[in-house]
Amino acid sequence: VPFTNRSLAAREAILSAARARFTEQGYDRTTIRQVATDANTDPSMVMRYYGSKDKLFAAAVAVDLRLPDLTDVPDDEVAGLLANHFVTMWRDDDDGPLTILLRSAVTHEDAAERLRAVFANQVTVMVRQLLGHGAETDLRAGLLSTHLLGVALSRHILRLPPVARLSDKDLVAITTQIVDHILTGPLPVKRAAKTGGRERRTRRS
């Protein structure tokens, strides 16, 4: 049965209240009753629309990283484009789904799994399209995700002063250098990235 305008508004109010609670308190401390009170509705309505706290959380943290299309981007511009994209995205998402997910992932395994899935399904796929398939490519994708999540955690959750004080411009410049090395630099590990018996090389060799 299609939702009416009234029910759609109620769902959105519940979702907005849930995001605010998850941002402020994290997953474990947030209750359906609190969300219902904040949304000016009854807990039964929250359950009717979303089914459970887990499903409400999943709806609140549905994330699309909106990754740029790198198909025709010159090799020497890829790192800068990605750095600018992620620095801007984290800034604009300060109280949004991605920040909620990152904050909750520290203490809640389901949130951690959802965050892993976001980066595996989006960042890893992007890096594979850029560099080809192989163990080394997946390692580079993992290192890229590690750096991007670490910067976000330090700047927007922990608010470590040296990182939090950086201007967006300076952070983009620093991140560009790191991302460039992660994607194209040598990796001092004893593992060859092979696909079909042939070693894969990075996009820029």
For each predicted feature, which ranges?
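Hydrophobic/aromatic-rich alpha-helical bundle segments in the mid-to-C-terminal region
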Residues: 112-116, 130-182, 186-195
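Hydrophobic alpha-helical connector segments
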Residues: 66-102
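Alpha-helical DNA-contacting segments of helix-turn-helix folds
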Residues: 57-64, 71
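Amphipathic alpha-helical segments used for helix-helix packing
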Residues: 61, 90-121
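Short alpha-helical scaffolding segments that buttress acidic/His motifs in well-ordered protein cores
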Residues: 86, 98-105, 144-148, 152
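Basic, helix-initiating cap at the start of DNA-binding domains
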Residues: 1-44, 54-55, 198-204
